[in-house]
């Protein structure tokens, strides 16, 4: 009921009462009705304001109404957090002792293979069909720039059970050097990270690999800088 309706009801009630002139009883009744009307209007106005400005009422978790405002990775993480924990997941890290190659390891404190995912021949084997978030990061490090142009590549590939051909799913190329370090000049260090990530429909038995072209430039100074993984959505 609106505030205006309440005021009209009170006024009609006052008009319906028998009017008495003079005397202390009539004065007390008028005072009582005036006080009651004021409290009723004040209470209704306060309730209306509280409801209107959302001070009271049901609390709802607010998210952007437009799904496009939420990043794909955020949507994937939110969806995964609401599902059972028996979905396939893997996170493997690079072996810092493997010289001249990028070798993935799962028997480490910061690595994980769960719910059917296997690491076989340096590839992740998908245990079941579905949508997967695939990701990988590498970090390159060098000292100075040689005369030959340095091109660093990082690629995630898939060999499907339906067709035994390697197909690139994600790939990136970076060049850390714009020009050669002049002779006699100080060779300054450079760093180049490359991150890849995307969502793909995979089949049971698919094999996934994450590879680079120049493993000698990999930086293993800190644990967890080079990794590869999948998460079933």
UniProtKB/Swiss-Prot annotation:
Record field: transmembrane: 36-56
Annotated positions for site Cleavage: 34-35, 39-40, 49-52, 76-77
Alphabetical keyword list: Cell membrane, Cytokine, Disulfide bond, Glycoprotein, Lipoprotein, Membrane, Myristate, Phosphoprotein, Secreted, Signal-anchor, Transmembrane, Transmembrane helix
Post-translational modification summary for this protein: The soluble form derives from the membrane form by proteolytic processing. The membrane-bound form is further proteolytically processed by SPPL2A or SPPL2B through regulated intramembrane proteolysis producing TNF intracellular domains (ICD1 and ICD2) released in the cytosol and TNF C-domain 1 and C-domain 2 secreted into the extracellular space.
Residues where Phosphoserine is found: 2
Gene Ontology cellular component annotations, sorted alphabetically: cell surface; extracellular space; plasma membrane
S-S bridge residues: 145-177
Ranges of the Extracellular topological domain: 57-233
GO MF annotations in UniProt: cytokine activity; tumor necrosis factor receptor binding
Limits of the THD domain: 88-233
Residue intervals on the Cytoplasmic side: 1-35
UniProt protein name: Tumor necrosis factor
Naturally occurring in which organism (per UniProt): Papio sp.
Organism taxonomic ancestry: Eukaryota, Metazoa, Chordata, Craniata, Vertebrata
Encoding gene (name): TNF
């Amino acid at each position: 009921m609106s505030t205006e309706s309440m005021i009209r009801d009170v006024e009609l009630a006052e008009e319906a009462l028998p009017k008495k002139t003079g005397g202390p009883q009539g004065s007390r009744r008028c005072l009582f009705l005036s006080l009651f009307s004021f409290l009723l209007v004040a209470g209704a106005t306060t309730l209306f304001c509280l409801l209107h400005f959302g001070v009271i009422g049901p609390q709802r978790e607010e998210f952007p109404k437009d799904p496009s405002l939420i990043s794909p990775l955020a949507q994937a993480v939110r969806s995964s957090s609401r599902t059972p924990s028996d979905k396939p997941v893997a996170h493997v890290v690079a072996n810092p002792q493997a010289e001249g190659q990028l070798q993935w390891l799962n028997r480490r404190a910061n690595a994980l293979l769960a719910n059917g995912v296997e690491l076989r021949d340096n590839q992740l084997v998908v245990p079941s069909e579905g949508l997967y978030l695939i990701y990988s990061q590498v970090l390159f490090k060098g000292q100075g720039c040689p005369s030959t142009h340095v091109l660093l590549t990082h690629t995630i590939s898939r060999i499907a059970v339906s067709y035994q051909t390697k197909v690139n799913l994600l790939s990136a190329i970076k060049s850390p050097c714009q020009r050669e370090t002049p002779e006699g000049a100080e060779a300054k260090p450079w760093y180049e990270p490359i991150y890849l990530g995307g969502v793909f429909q995979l089949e049971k038995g698919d094999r996934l690999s994450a590879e680079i072209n120049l493993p000698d430039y990999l930086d293993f100074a800190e644990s967890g800088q080079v990794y590869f993984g999948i998460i079933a959505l």
